[in-house]
Swiss-Prot record:
NCBIfam families: rplX_bact. It comes from Vibrio campbellii (strain ATCC BAA-1116). GO terms for molecular function: rRNA binding; structural constituent of ribosome. One of its GO terms (biological process) is translation. Belongs to the universal ribosomal protein uL24 family. The keyword Zinc does not apply. This is Large ribosomal subunit protein uL24. Keywords: Ribonucleoprotein, Ribosomal protein, RNA-binding, rRNA-binding.
Amino acid sequence: MAAKIRRNDEVIVLAGKDKGKKGKVTKVLATGKVIVEGINLVKKHQKPVPALGIQGGIVEQEAAIDVSNVAIFNAATGKADRIGFRFEDGKKVRFFKSNNEIVSN
């Protein structure tokens, strides 16, 4: 199945503690989850590793969020939107369902 949400897409969170927040997708995981910049922050207790120069302590980092809990943000409408696929000039392109505009990659 083609990826409806890809890296560098602007998304809005639909459910969870960060509902309504917008962010940029930094990574799409094969498990059906995405990592969004500044969203779903968790505290990790990092053990120091002097050989690698890693300092210990409590570190905040982004955790994965299920792809069903985010929707692509349509800048033209200012709302969350759905994605469709169609062929144009022999290439498969993504488009917003609300206004049929092609999603820029």
